[in-house]
Every structure is written in C-alpha cells, then in structure tokens.
C-alpha cells in the first residue's frame, strides 16, 4: 500500500475504509442468521457457530499477520484482505437469501458525527491523561466536548421517529446484558492481546510469526467451544453460560499472570482457558442480543452488538493500555539520571535508546525496563481478570427470566 502511495493520510484513509466495510458486513451476517433460522434451538446453535468463527477469525489475525511479516513486505497485511474478500463474495452470493430491507430509513449523518466526535473526545482525554506529561486542560476540554456530543446523540436518538439506535431495546434486560457482556469480554481480550504480544516480542524475543503461533490456542479454543455454547444456551440459559464463560476467562487471565515466567505448558493452558471463556461469552451474548428482539429490529440489534465489540476493543486498548503505560513509567528505575525521559514512555522506546548507549549502561537499562514492563504486564492481566470476575458476579445476581429454561433435573433411575 505504501509503495502505491507513500502517505500516512492514504494509509489512515484505507484503514477507515476497512472499518466501514466491516461495520456494514458484520451486522448483516448476524441478521441473516436471525432471519434464516426460525427454531430457537437451531438459531442458538447457528449463532454459536457464527460467534466461534467471528472470534476465531479475530484472534487469528495476529497469526496471519505474523506469517506475512516474517516472509513478505509489511503492506501485505492489508493486501491479503483483497483475495479473501473476493473469494468470500463469490461463495456467499449464491447462498445468501434475499431479505427485504427498510429502504426508506434515512441515514442520520448528524447523529453519526455526534457519536464519532463524542467517542474520539472521550478516548483522547483518557489517552492524554495517561501520558508522561499530560496537558490537563486539553484533556478536560476533550472529555467535556466528547460527553456533550454523546449527550446530544442520545437526546437526538430518543426524539427521532426512526433512530439509528432505538434505546427502547435496552429496556429488555436480557438484551442489555448481552450487549454489556460482549463489550466487557472484548475489552479484556483486546487489552490482554495488547500487552501479551509486546511481552512475547520485546521481552521473550519471539519473532512476529512465533508470537502469533503462541497465541493460537485462543482462537482454536474459541472455535471449538462456540457451537457447544450455542447448544447449551437453550438448555441451561444465557445467564449460566455467560457467567461460567466469564469465570473461565478470568481464570485464564489470572493463570497467565501467575505463569508468564513458568513453563510454556502452563501459559498455553491459560490461553486455552481464556479462549474457552471468550468463545462461550461471545456466543451467549450474541444469543441474548438476537433472540430478544423481533425480526424487524434484528438488523439494528446486530449493529448494536457489533458496536459493542468495536467499542470494547477501543476501551480495552485505551484503559488497559493507559494502565500499562502508567505502571511501566512508575516502576522503571533508571540506571542513569542523564537518560532521556522518553525511556519511561514504553519498553520499545527504552530498547531504542539502549541501542545508542555504552554496553554496560544499555544492558542495565534493558534489564530494568523489562522488569518494569513485567510489572505493567501483570497489572493489566489482573485488572482484566478482575473485570471479568466482577462481570460474572453481576450476571449471577440477575434473576433468571421466566422464559429462560430451568436447569435439567438430576437423572434418577
């Protein structure tokens, strides 16, 4: 891509195009599942398969990216999407059923701008406050501007005759719970992947390919457990499946925090637990979202769930990434007062600075920087584990809906 046009603006625009395409495609796929399968148990199983493929595909991204970066030009991580999309389009067109849409619904351009600027303002404020020398005035201004835009967006949607987001859907607690679980699970997974990929490459010294292969248990476990969770939801209920999945994910993160310096087997077992928890949580959350709206609202419900995934990723990177930077900067003890202040920004900066230092000072700086990063790494994993555990407890405290299936009676002879 850069060979075609060596411009940062072009790269950002291309990334924005990818995001728009994904935002249009993912809700449509889930809405199709909702339309095609009418039996509730079949629909739950189909959603489980959908969730397992979606979560596995997202987690496989680092693996494929590692392979491409190992053997090809870095722009190949973008160009690989072209043949994949072309093949998927050719295979999908004959199989996708025709579903009548609401073509009269207008596009709310102002509402789209309000929510976009609102999220950008809040996210920027959080990132600015976590910087080494934050501009508090700018951060407060961005936060206030962002919250004002979000308030105006909510007010506009509540008054609109055909809103982008019908907030009345959230009156259904099962729907709202599914959206919340999807957001929280994505926050934890993306935050974990952010720090773990850096730990594998910058601390353990793995190549991008080996680092991608190391996290392969997550998508594989998600792929296997998704259909199983879809089969369990109609029998055990959404609450139980979500609670169990969140607890398994929390256990996986806790295990990784305790075993990251241990044998590889212990780390891989923790990653499998995390994959099982994430796959189960995504399936149960998707089922709760899609089975608690009428068919006419399925497209909007699918879009809301997709937003929860994307927003969870943004919040996970922002909050847990900020926590990582904060703990790293506070934990780093510099071997010399003459070192540039940017070594406290990140481990990557410290390693770059070390390349221009005397061997003894460089070796000491690298050692101390990696120790500080280890502390930040553990802090992020523990925070993500606590988030999933508290979410599981919140789900557990919710009353079981009358329409949710009771657990099967014990088998008696």
Predicted regions: what is each one?
Residues 1-110, 137:
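Helix-loop-helix hairpins in multi-pass membrane proteins, especially solute transporters
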